[in-house]
Regions:
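Active-site neighborhoods of divalent-metal-dependent phosphate/nucleic-acid chemistry enzymes
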Residues: 66-112
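Short loop->beta-strand "edge-of-pocket" segments that line small-molecule binding or catalytic clefts
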Residues: 32-34, 63-69
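Short, well-structured N-terminal submotif of metal-dependent ribonuclease cores
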Residues: 1-35, 45-59
């Protein structure tokens, strides 16, 4: 399973009572987990914004996730995905969203996300 950054943030917040957290946990419990190297920057940004030293959450990601490198092919595919999603009416679909989805597709993984911009993508599980 490939995790979107908003799902990673939910994991860091770790509220066992949350139905959303329980759903995420059920989906990823025994699956190998993947993220894009790009998301390390997003998590660092989230950490700094929330006055958390980014070293700990990034260390956790490095220990528990398979980190997919950013390649030229993924970048090009990400921009193509952004273009296609915007043409489908997803006006807020970003290049970052496209790169994350392209990274998941590059290794034949399903993306798990809370981001409504992905609702029209066939290979995304919305939580």
């Amino acid at each position: 399973m490939f995790l979107d950054t908003n799902v990673i943030v939910d994991i860091f917040r770790f509220d066992e009572e949350s139905k959303n957290f329980q759903k995420i946990f059920e989906l990823i419990r025994d699956a190998p987990l993947y993220i894009s190297v790009f998301q390390i920057g997003e998590i660092s940004d989230w950490s700094l914004t929330n006055k958390v030293d980014p070293i700990e959450p990034i260390g956790f990601l490095k220990k528990t996730m398979n980190i997919i490198p950013l390649t030229e092919d993924i970048c090009l595919e990400g921009s193509k995905i952004k273009y296609e999603m915007r043409n489908k009416g997803e006006k807020n679909f970003s290049l970052a969203d496209g790169i994350i989805l392209a990274s998941a597709r590059s290794i034949n993984q399903t993306l798990i996300s809370k981001d409504g911009d992905f609702k029209q993508a066939k290979d995304v599980i919305m939580v």
